[in-house]
């Protein structure tokens, strides 16, 4: 049996295949996922799993160099924004509009759907390198 934190085989596979600057997104349960991206649907019921649980788990497995957030997140969901900043540390944050974020999802290796219902609980993680 796998010993590391991440048990979901589809998510583990995507992360294992990611190279420098590849992107993966985590979204709330309402985020539209484009056909161009692999859908990894973790949503069970409202709120399970949460956006933050999913983000923290992925960060155990994936080195990131940048995150992309919708500009609206800071104003509409300030508590979530502060939690994200706390978890990512000194990682670069790029802000784009929510509409631009939805378009950028087409370039992501996968979009992970959570049970989160907080508005604008969506993020794109850009893979870094461990050296």
Swiss-Prot record:
GO terms for biological process: D-ribose catabolic process. It holds the Pfam family RbsD_FucU. It comes from the Bacteria. The keyword Isomerase applies. Its EC number is 5.4.99.62. Substrate binds at residues 28, 98, 120-122. Pathway: Carbohydrate metabolism; D-ribose degradation; D-ribose 5-phosphate from beta-D-ribopyranose: step 1/2. It catalyses: beta-D-ribopyranose = beta-D-ribofuranose. GO terms for molecular function: D-ribose pyranase activity; intramolecular lyase activity; monosaccharide binding. Disulfide bonds: none annotated. Its main location: cytoplasm. Keywords: Carbohydrate metabolism, Cytoplasm, Isomerase. Homodecamer. Belongs to the RbsD / FucU family. RbsD subfamily. Catalyzes the interconversion of beta-pyran and beta-furan forms of D-ribose. This is D-ribose pyranase. The gene is rbsD.
């Amino acid at each position: 049996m796998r010993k590391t934190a991440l048990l979901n085989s589809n998510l583990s596979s995507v992360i294992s295949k990611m190279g420098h600057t590849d992107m993966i997104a985590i979204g709330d349960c309402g985020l539209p996922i484009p056909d161009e991206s692999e859908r990894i649907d973790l949503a069970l019921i409202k709120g399970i799993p949460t956006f933050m649980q999913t983000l923290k788990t992925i960060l155990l497995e994936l080195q990131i160099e940048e995150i992309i957030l919708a500009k609206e997140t800071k104003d509409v969901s300030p508590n979530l924004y502060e939690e994200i900043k706390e978890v990512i540390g000194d990682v670069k944050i790029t802000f784009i509009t929510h509409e631009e974020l939805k378009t950028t999802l087409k370039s992501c290796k996968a979009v992970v759907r959570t049970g989160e219902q907080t508005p604008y609980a969506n993020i794109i993680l850009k893979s870094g390198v461990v050296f």
